[in-house]
């Protein structure tokens, strides 16, 4: 039999023969002697084991994961250092210069930053999906790895810088609401500026929190218009609210982030355009939608521009006479106060609302102030001094203590009887008794005493520092009493030369600005000075024209800084009421003022529903 080619079976035969011999030598009795019980005592290790530093291992794993996420978010370079191949890493470790040497042509094209991809507008993916859904983390990690390795595709860049987040939110808002956020709101540059009404758009709000937001906002607001806008690619909370107190943007965002678990960068907050008809119609139409939650009374600026009855009221033209009547009744003669306080009335007065809508506000304010001054000047001219004082006292509310005035005069060692006689002659305007001088050392209360009296009587102040102007005496034409505070030697020289008739109480000619010189009877004049005019012979012609009293002692103050003598309007009112007869002021019943007088001037016709 021929051997098989390529095979040799000698070794196998020998091995089989050895195995047979071994089995024959082994007897069955020996197999019975083999113990079938195994020793398992060392199988379980019951020795105490050390746990090891598992916290350190967990910390390393967390750090590595955070570093990987951070590298995935880098946008400035498309290729992260961790994306290099092993060969590139070896070359860079050998020499940095070798890395720049390459046979193939390098592509020097710079990739531009892709702000918006086709499928994503730039916001985080978490804002596009419901937070209650389960998200496969491995898929997100794979996608981020593709981005930081240079693969710029449909995924795009999901995180924008802070300056671009607002642009992305505005774009999302316009796509969903159908109108631009800036068309509904006016921009506040400062976060500290306060407003009562706010328009809010909040992204990232869970749907199960909407009902709780409605309840929580009612404790802070008087009006709420809320809608949870949901589309395929967008979801946000849209609100128009009026708070119980005015709040700044900083306070509003802090309140929203306290109520809702959202980030402040995903909140748009601006005050609404309260004078835009289009914006008012937008809010009015939304309030009637079934998907919008509305709580509270409709805001007045929405009702005024949408409801028919309010539209008819707002169409009434502006009437200057109503504005003049308001300024006259409230005693406003300064243009700045008239403009400000009348603008405040726009919410409740239709004529003030028409004033704000006018393009000639400055002209109306100027004309109003001028007309009020004309009326008040004519009214003051026809009043006697007694009637004028009675009217000023009637404007003071409350009662005081006349003894405070008397104590102060006695403290300054002023004879009370002599002072009352001079004060009576001053108010009556007797010739040669038309000027009352209070002189003495500094800090004795001269100016305080005279200015408190001038404030009660509604007088005017003239200053010698304006004597270079020929109009410096013009305030005396509109006053029942005047004050020249702190007269010095040049002032007394001027009065000795030019103002002797004024000190006599005679008729003088005063040059008025933008008007012809006017002849008036000089009103009673109070003067304070540190100079005793009657003791100086150089002003001997003024001695008979001035009644002088000296304040010798320094004005006292209490430990807490309050004045030792209270020279208030209430105390002066009590003083005049107590010494009305001694000052020879006429009885108001004799002048026809039996009780409070009726309104002396009415510029507008009485309304049909106004009581007589």
From Swiss-Prot:
Q: Indicate which residues form the motif Nuclear export signal.
A: 94-103
Keywords from the named record = ATP-binding, DNA replication, DNA-binding, Early protein, Helicase, Host nucleus, Hydrolase, Isomerase, Isopeptide bond, Nucleotide-binding, Phosphoprotein, Ubl conjugation
According to the UniProt record, list the residues that bear Phosphoserine.
Answer: 80, 95
SUPFAM superfamilies assigned to the protein according to its UniProt record, in alphabetical order: Origin of replication-binding domain, RBD-like, P-loop containing nucleoside triphosphate hydrolases
Q: Name one GO biological process term.
A: DNA replication
Name the major location. Answer: host cell
This enzyme catalyses: Couples ATP hydrolysis with the unwinding of duplex DNA by translocating in the 3'-5' direction; ATP + H2O = ADP + phosphate + H(+)
Subcellular location field: Host nucleus
Q: Give the region (DNA-binding region) as residue ranges.
A: 148-315
Cross-link position, Glycyl lysine isopeptide (Lys-Gly) (interchain with G-Cter in SUMO)? 521
Q: The motif Nuclear localization signal: which residues? A: 74-76
Pfam families assigned to the protein according to its UniProt record, in alphabetical order: PPV_E1_C, PPV_E1_DBD, PPV_E1_N
Give the GO cellular component terms, alphabetically: host cell nucleus
GO molecular function, a single term: ATP hydrolysis activity
Keyword Transferase appears in the UniProt entry: no
How is this chain modified after translation?
A: Phosphorylated.
Q: Which residues bind ATP?
A: 440-447
Q: What is its EC number?
A: 5.6.2.4
**Which parts of this chain are annotated as the region Disordered?**
587-612
Give residue ranges for domain SF3 helicase: 414-564
- Function summary: ATP-dependent DNA 3'-5' helicase required for initiation of viral DNA replication. It forms a complex with the viral E2 protein. The E1-E2 complex binds to the replication origin which contains binding sites for both proteins. During the initial step, a dimer of E1 interacts with a dimer of protein E2 leading to a complex that binds the viral origin of replication with high specificity. Then, a second dimer of E1 displaces the E2 dimer in an ATP-dependent manner to form the E1 tetramer.
Q: What is its quaternary makeup?
A: Can form hexamers. Interacts with E2 protein; this interaction increases E1 DNA binding specificity. Interacts with host DNA polymerase subunit POLA2. Interacts with host single stranded DNA-binding protein RPA1. Interacts with host TOP1; this interaction stimulates the enzymatic activity of TOP1.
**Belongs to which family?**
Belongs to the papillomaviridae E1 protein family.
Its name, as the record gives it, is Replication protein E1
Q: Record the organism.
A: Human papillomavirus type 1
Source taxonomy: Viruses, Monodnaviria, Shotokuvirae, Cossaviricota, Papovaviricetes
Q: Which gene encodes it?
A: E1
């Amino acid at each position: 039999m021929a051997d098989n080619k390529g095979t040799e079976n000698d070794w196998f035969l020998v091995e089989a023969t050895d195995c047979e011999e071994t089995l024959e030598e082994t007897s069955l009795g020996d197999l019975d002697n083999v113990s079938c019980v195994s020793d398992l005592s060392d199988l379980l290790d019951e020795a105490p084991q050390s746990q090891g530093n598992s916290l350190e291992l967990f910390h390393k794993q967390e750090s590595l994961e955070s570093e990987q996420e951070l590298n995935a978010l880098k946008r400035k370079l498309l290729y992260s250092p961790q994306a290099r191949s092993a060969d590139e890493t070896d070359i860079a470790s050998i020499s940095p210069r070798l890395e720049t040497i390459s046979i193939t042509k390098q592509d020097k094209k710079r990739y531009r930053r892709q702000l918006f991809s086709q499928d994503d507008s730039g916001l985080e993916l978490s804002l596009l999906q419901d937070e209650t859904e389960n998200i496969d983390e491995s898929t997100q990690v794979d996608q981020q790895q593709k981005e930081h390795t240079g693969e710029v595709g449909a995924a795009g860049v999901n995180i924008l810088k802070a300056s671009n987040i607002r642009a992305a939110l505005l774009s999302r808002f316009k796509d969903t609401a159908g109108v631009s956020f800036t068309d509904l709101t006016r921009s506040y540059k400062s976060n500290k500026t306060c407003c009562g009404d706010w328009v809010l758009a909040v992204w990232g709000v869970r749907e199960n929190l909407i009902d709780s937001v409605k309840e929580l906002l009612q404790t802070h607001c008087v009006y709420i218009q809320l809608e949870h806008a949901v589309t395929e690619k967008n979801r946000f909370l849209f609100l128009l609210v009026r708070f119980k107190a005015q709040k700044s943007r900083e306070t509003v965002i802090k309140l929203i982030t306290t109520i809702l678990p959202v980030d402040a960068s995903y909140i748009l907050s601006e005050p609404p355009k309260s004078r835009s008809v289009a914006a008012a119609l937008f809010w009015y139409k939304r309030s009637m939608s079934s998907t919008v939650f509305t709580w509270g009374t409709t805001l007045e600026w929405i009702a005024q521009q949408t409801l028919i009855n309010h539209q008819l009221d707002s169409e009434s033209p502006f009437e200057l006479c109503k504005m003049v009547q308001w300024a006259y009744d409230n005693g406003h003669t300064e243009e700045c106060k008239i403009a400000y306080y009348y603008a405040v009335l726009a919410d409740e007065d239709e004529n003030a609302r028409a004033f704000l809508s006018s393009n000639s506000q400055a002209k109306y304010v100027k004309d109003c102030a001028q007309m009020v001054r004309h009326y008040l000047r004519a009214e003051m001219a026809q009043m006697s001094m007694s009637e004028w004082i009675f009217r000023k006292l009637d404007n003071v509310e409350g009662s005081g203590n006349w003894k405070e005035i008397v104590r102060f005069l006695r403290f300054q060692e002023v004879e009370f009887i002599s002072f009352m006689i001079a004060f009576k002659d001053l108010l009556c305007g007797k010739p040669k008794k038309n000027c009352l001088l209070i002189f003495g050392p500094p800090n004795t209360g001269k100016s305080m005493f005279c200015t408190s009296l001038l404030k009660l009587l509604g007088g005017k102040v003239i200053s010698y520092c304006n004597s270079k102007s020929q109009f410096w005496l013009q305030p005396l034409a509109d006053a029942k009493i005047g004050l020249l505070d702190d007269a010095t030697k040049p002032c007394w020289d001027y009065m000795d030369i030019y103002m002797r008739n004024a000190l006599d109480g005679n008729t003088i000619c005063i040059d008025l600005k933008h008007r012809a010189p006017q002849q008036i009877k000089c009103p009673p004049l109070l003067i304070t000075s540190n100079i005793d005019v009657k003791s100086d012979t150089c002003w001997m012609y003024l001695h008979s024209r001035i009644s002088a009293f000296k304040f010798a002692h320094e004005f006292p103050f209490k430990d807490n800084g309050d004045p030792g003598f209270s020279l208030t309007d209430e105390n002066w009112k009590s003083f005049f009421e107590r010494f009305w007869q001694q000052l020879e002021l006429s009885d108001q019943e004799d002048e026809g003022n039996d009780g409070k007088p009726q309104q002396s001037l009415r510029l507008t016709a009485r309304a049909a529903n106004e009581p007589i």
